[in-house]
Amino acid sequence: MSLEVNVTKRFDGFTLHAAFTAGDTATALLGASGCGKSMTLRCIAGIVRPDEGRIVLDGRVLFDRAQGIDLPPQQRNVGLLFQNYALFPNMTVEQNILCALKKEKDPAARRAACAEALRAMRLEELAKRLPGALSGGQQQRAALARILAAKPRILMLDEPFSALDSYLREEVEGEVGSLLAGFAGTALLVTHNRDEAYRLCREMIVMDSGEVLRAGTTKEVFANPRTRAAARLTGCKNILPCTRVGEHTVHLAGWEQPLTVALPVPEGCRAVGIRAHDFAPCAPGTPNSLPVQAVSTSENPFDWNMIFTLPGGETRLWWKVSKETLAAPPPKAPACLAAAPENIMPLV
């Protein structure tokens, strides 16, 4: 199963150009609010018509502007979970699911498919309840049951945890993770949360300002985001201006000692990224080290966040260290931090 998307949609002051492919695995669309992630899902679902381009699912053309093809949503066999779940408020959970099975003309087959969806989402005891009588997590399961009952060829989840209280998210995330892992087809997860994307999806597409910045396996994208914007969106706080010296060497602005980089440094490299947990205290003069001055320390439940400045005082560095490694902040903060070559990411 495969999805091919190459579409353009223009609005006043904003243009979406989404071009990517996705296979039969869970793929995250990661980006800040307003970057075009949700609009991309709506184009795929047929809710929004692109101005240009083409969408193909398993060799079947869903949209092709040049050929005049634009299948209506009900013919695309696409399941889209909206942020607010879009359950019919005056219908029970069971009735909501049966609405998705209108194409099935055999009443017995409809009832059987509905019962299967209720069992799959553990909703048997809630079948006769209205959506307003359900918790946020139960409403989400009901919406997913309605989608899955129709057996879509692609499952799309638009910020599925945004409407949930924080204490529910971990439980619901586990359920969604199991669903994505067991879904036999293409699944797209829209999120602005890099941790959710990393935990739930094997593939990742990073979007910014209507454009795809980076695509690949989730681990590849985190290890080598390639651009400063993609690095920030994947959570890298330390993005340091530099100049390219050689294929594996850069100079940081205002610091004479070169840094060795394991990844090839592209010609257009203008910065390096170092994730906060990839620093380690070191002695002055250690290769790939930076002299630092402590600014502040803050405590989280399981780790410490320390902020330093580089010489000159304008550039800040974030260092995150687990409490298993460091039970308490040292009386004297380290004067030097180092990063291994494999943990330095060249960025354009």
Label each PLM-derived region with a short phrase.
Residues I47, V78, F82-F88, N193:
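Catalytic "switch" loops of ABC-type ATPases
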Residues R42-C43, E203:
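The short alpha-helix immediately C-terminal to the Walker A/P-loop
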Residues V48-R49, V56, K102, A181:
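A position-specific signal in ABC ATPase nucleotide-binding domains
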Residues V5-A26, L30-A32, S38-M39, G46-R49, ...:
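Non-catalytic connector elements of ABC transporters
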Residues S38-L41, R141-A142:
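ABC ATPase nucleotide-binding domain helices that frame the ATP-binding cleft
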Residues N77, T92-A229:
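ABC ATPase nucleotide-binding domains
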Residues R54-R76:
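ABC ATPase NBD Q-loop/coupling interface
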Residues A223-G246, G273:
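C-terminal boundary and immediately downstream tail of ABC-type ATPase nucleotide-binding domains
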